[in-house]
UniProtKB/Swiss-Prot annotation:
The gene is rps10. Disulfide bonds: none annotated. One of its GO terms (molecular function) is tRNA binding. SMART domains: Ribosomal_S10 (SM01403). Part of the 30S ribosomal subunit. One of its GO terms (cellular component) is small ribosomal subunit. This is Small ribosomal subunit protein uS10. It comes from the Archaea. Involved in the binding of tRNA to the ribosomes.
Amino acid sequence: MQKARIKLSSTQHTELDGVCDQIKAIAEKTGVDMSGPIPLPTKALKVTTRKSTDGEGSSSFDRWTMRVHKRVIDIEADERTMKHIMKVRIPDTVQIEIELRN
């Protein structure tokens, strides 16, 4: 049977966990084997910018960070389960990638 690897990433971990819970509920309802959601390391993207635009005055900086949270779910990919997963409402902040494997 084919397996599907579902990769999810988002900057909002609560919305990401909500989508993972929906996929987990679908797997339990249809009775397919599932492993995950496996949390991958959170990537912190940092940008430091100088507050003063003209270069004069004291050197003060703004530090901005954005954290990207990732999850991986492996699931058996029968047709009924995949149709249910495709109908899940995904928030705009969550990116999803589905890869089918033999």
